[in-house]
Amino acid sequence: MKWIVTEIDGKVASIAGDYRHLAGIAARIAAHSPDAVERIATRKITTDELVELGKALRWEDLCLYGSKFQKAVWKALFDLTHPVDGEDACHFDQAKRVEKSPLMSYSDLAARVDNPQGVRAVAHAVALNPVAYVIPCHLIVPKESVDKIHEIRRSAEATLFRGSDLYLLDSISVGEYAYGPEIKLELIKKQLAK
């Protein structure tokens, strides 16, 4: 699969499998003065190049159009795979159920953005994510799958496989994704292999 990267003045505004986000960005910037944007560029990259780009980008390298709430949800997702304040990526507070895996449910993410009752609003913000993989919406999986992962981990703690991930991604449901569950599974595997 080829990914389309759209940059505005050198900052990544979208990464997608089609041009729909570019059309949305064009509509947003059309409301501004022509001087507001110096340069808009697009390029196509492979999934492996996307993984490398995802490692290199910082939050400040993104040019995002969305509401304050959407940006808060996207930032929480971004923080799943990018170190925050000296933390290791994918290592968070046990109270938020994330443990060392970046896979989480919509309700887990809603709790992370301090809006546990706003699961639907969080799901909507995730669906509008303009920067695939870098803002890793593909790491949101059904709650049942997250629960299964945690149960396997608890069982593993009592064995000599303590701390190992015994679950196979192929054995859990990864849920829906704009580009299909096969692409989502591929992105999850690449993310976890980092």
Pin down the residues of each PLM region.
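Basic nucleic-acid-binding alpha-helical/helix-turn surface characteristic of O6-alkylguanine DNA
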Residues: 1-116, 150-168, 182-194
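Short glycine/serine-rich loop segments
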Residues: 116-185
